[in-house]
Amino acid sequence: MDVLKKGFSFAKEGVVAAAEKTKQGVQDAAEKTKQGVQDAAEKTKEGVMYVGTKTKEGVVQSVNTVTEKTKEQANVVGGAVVAGVNTVASKTVEGVENVAAASGVVKLDEHGREIPAEQVAEGKQTTQEPLVEATEATEETGK
C-alpha cells in the first residue's frame, strides 16, 4: 500500500507542478498580451494624432487660402466701389455746375471758369488767372 501511496504522492506532485507551470504560462501569456495591447493602443494613438495633425494643418491651410482670396476679392470690390463713387461724384459736380451756369446763378468766362460775383457787379468779366490744365495734382491742390 505504501507503494500505492507513494505513486499517488508522485502523481499529485506532478499534477501540482504541471498546474503551477500552466498557471505561470498563462500569466506570462496574459502579461505579453497586455503589453501587446498597450503597444497597439499606443501605436493607434500615435496614428490618430498624426492624422489629426495633418487634418488640422490642411484645415488651417484651407482657411488661410480662403482668407487670402476673400481679401483679394474685397480689394477688387473696394477699388471698383471707390471708382464708381468718384465717377458719380464727378458727374454730380458737373451737373450742379451746368445747372448753376444755365440758371444764371453763376457766370462763366469764355473758358468755362466761374467769374467771381464782385467782378460781375463791376462789369469785369475776365479773370487774370492763367489757364491750367486740370490734372489730378491741380485738383488736389486747388491750383
UniProtKB/Swiss-Prot annotation:
Nervous system tissue. Found in the electric lobe, the brain and the spinal cord. GO terms for molecular function: cuprous ion binding. Residues 113-143 are annotated as: Disordered. It is found in: Nucleus. Keywords: Nucleus, Repeat. GO terms for cellular component: axon terminus; cytoplasm; neuronal cell body; nucleus. Signal peptide: none annotated. It holds the Pfam family Synuclein. Sequence repeats lie at residues 20-30, 31-41, 42-52, 53-67, 68-78. GO terms for biological process: chemical synaptic transmission; synapse organization; synaptic vesicle endocytosis. Residues 20-78 are annotated as: 5 X 11 AA tandem repeats of [EGST]-K-T-K-[EQ]-[GQ]-[VA]-X(4). May have a role in synaptic regulation or signal transduction. Belongs to the synuclein family. Three isoforms are detected: 17.5 kDa, 18.5 kDa and 20.0 kDa. In the neuronal cell soma, the 17.5 kDa species is predominant. This is Synuclein.
